[in-house]
């Protein structure tokens, strides 16, 4: 049995909460972020939410989370796994720290599917995918420096100078 499920983050722009699910409107979100003087924030899914997702009929369950450097999702997924394992100690669940975001997570999911379709054991899939993650590098390009300035990762002066010189971080 295949059990694919996306567990969304909750994004906050000002006082508004936006769920990052299939209804997410990226253009609308970007407009709201640009219009808001505060930096957007996010909340990771709860351990209970992960636990519910793990409660499926699949023999092998793999969770791929945002980088633990960017989000608490990895820790929540681990806690959710521990909770479900209390009642289902025979479940095979592995949580992958993607060390990435966006397309990096998708590529990891595709690698898991490729390994499963090749008939690898649970342990072989985990080992192969962990090795794959170690070799993966994801780069981001920012359109502007506003969010870095808003969240304090870049001073107002540095953001102003970099924007005036049309410098973007890489």
What are these regions (language model features)?
Residues 45-61, 65-81, 85-87:
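Active-site cofactor/cluster-binding pocket
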């Amino acid at each position: 049995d295949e059990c694919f499920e996306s567990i969304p983050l909750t994004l906050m722009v000002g006082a508004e909460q936006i769920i990052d699910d299939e209804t997410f409107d990226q253009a609308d979100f970007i407009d709201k972020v640009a219009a808001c003087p505060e930096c957007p924030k996010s909340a990771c899914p709860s351990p209970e939410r992960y636990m519910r997702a793990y409660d499926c009929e699949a023999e092998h369950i793999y969770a791929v989370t945002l980088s633990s450097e960017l989000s608490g999702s990895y820790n929540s997924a681990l806690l959710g796994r521990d909770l479900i394992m209390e009642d289902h100690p025979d479940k095979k669940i592995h949580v992958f720290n993607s060390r990435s975001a966006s397309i990096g997570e998708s590529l990891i999911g595709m690698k898991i599917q490729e390994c499963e379709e090749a008939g690898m054991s649970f342990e072989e899939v985990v080992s192969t995918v962990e090795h794959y993650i170690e070799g993966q590098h994801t780069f981001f390009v920012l359109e502007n420096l506003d969010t870095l300035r808003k969240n304090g990762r870049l001073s107002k002066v540095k953001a102003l100078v970099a924007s005036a010189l049309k410098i973007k971080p890489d």
